[in-house]
């Protein structure tokens, strides 16, 4: 029986940390294989998938790692870290027989295409996974903002924010055992309750463009597929 697909084209935001697994830094092979396997399953269902990946598993511009380094320089280093992650994802997809393309907001033609919106949309329509690297290409903007921007540019049905928790909670579930998960919440309610769904710039862009967000746990087996088919998974942040 063919499963109902709620979202035809999605922008998936993956943090760099989600690729570390149990390692203290870098890319964990088993973790990236598991993550890509989950995504490949929905691609085979006919879902068009764009991915924005962070670089925090390698280097984060806003961190103690950067020390007294110039902020713009540190951010550019973080962008290059996202390119490394994007190449690793592309390799993992192609190992599974899924065609993938990396588009970078910074020009590095030997290893990735330079971002071009029409070409990216064409790839999505052809069933290829498009991995957007190097954030927005500008310092001082997070990869959350890059994800909101690419999601809007690609005319995605939804932005999927993969995290290490399975949704948005009333409080930090690691600190407060009585915290409960929201199944749905509006943008206005999230602002009123000061729930940190993502950074303010990204959140404002999604709200303005009416790009709904689903926050879910990518490490939970089958979670992405359940989101795509409209099951109760994660938290839907909507207009």
From Swiss-Prot:
Molecular function per GO = ATP binding; UMP kinase activity
CDD domains reported in the protein's UniProt record: AAK_UMPK-PyrH-Ec (cd04254)
Q: Which NCBIfam families match?
A: pyrH_bact (TIGR02075)
Q: How does it assemble?
A: Homohexamer.
Q: What is the lineage of its organism?
A: Bacteria, Pseudomonadati, Pseudomonadota, Betaproteobacteria, Neisseriales
- What does the similarity note say? Belongs to the UMP kinase family.
Q: Does the keyword NAD apply?
A: no
Q: Reaction catalysed by this chain? A: UMP + ATP = UDP + ADP
> Could you tell me the gene encoding this protein?
pyrH
- Name of the featured protein: Uridylate kinase
Q: What is its main location?
A: cytoplasm
Binding site residues for ATP: 13-16, 56, 60, 163-164, 169, 172
The EC number(s) given in the record are 2.7.4.22
Record's GO cellular component terms: cytosol
Keyword entries, A-Z? Allosteric enzyme, ATP-binding, Cytoplasm, Kinase, Nucleotide-binding, Pyrimidine biosynthesis, Transferase
């Amino acid at each position: 029986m063919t499963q109902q697909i709620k979202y035809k084209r999605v922008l998936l935001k993956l943090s760099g940390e989600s690729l570390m697994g149990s390692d203290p830094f870098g890319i964990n092979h088993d973790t990236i294989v598991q993550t890509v396997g989950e995504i490949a399953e929905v691609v085979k269902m006919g879902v068009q998938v764009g991915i924005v990946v962070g670089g925090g598993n390698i280097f984060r511009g806003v961190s103690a790692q950067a020390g007294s380094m110039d902020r713009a320089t540190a951010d550019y280093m973080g962008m290059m870290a996202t390119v490394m992650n994007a190449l690793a994802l592309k390799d993992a997809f192609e190992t599974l027989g899924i065609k993938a393309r990396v588009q970078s907001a910074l020009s590095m033609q030997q290893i990735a295409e330079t971002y071009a919106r029409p070409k990216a949309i064409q790839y999505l329509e052809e069933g290829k996974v498009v991995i957007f690297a190097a954030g927005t290409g500008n310092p001082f903007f997070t990869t959350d903002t890059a994800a909101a921007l690419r999601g809007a540019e690609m005319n995605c049905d939804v932005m999927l924010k993969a995290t290490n928790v399975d949704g948005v909670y009333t409080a930090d579930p690691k600190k407060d055992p009585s915290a409960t998960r929201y199944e749905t919440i509006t943008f206005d309610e999230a602002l009123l309750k000061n729930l940190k769904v993502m950074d303010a710039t990204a959140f404002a862009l999604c709200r303005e463009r009416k790009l709904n967000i689903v926050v879910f746990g990518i490490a939970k087996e089958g979670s992405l597929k359940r989101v795509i088919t409209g099951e109760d998974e994660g938290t839907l942040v909507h207009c």
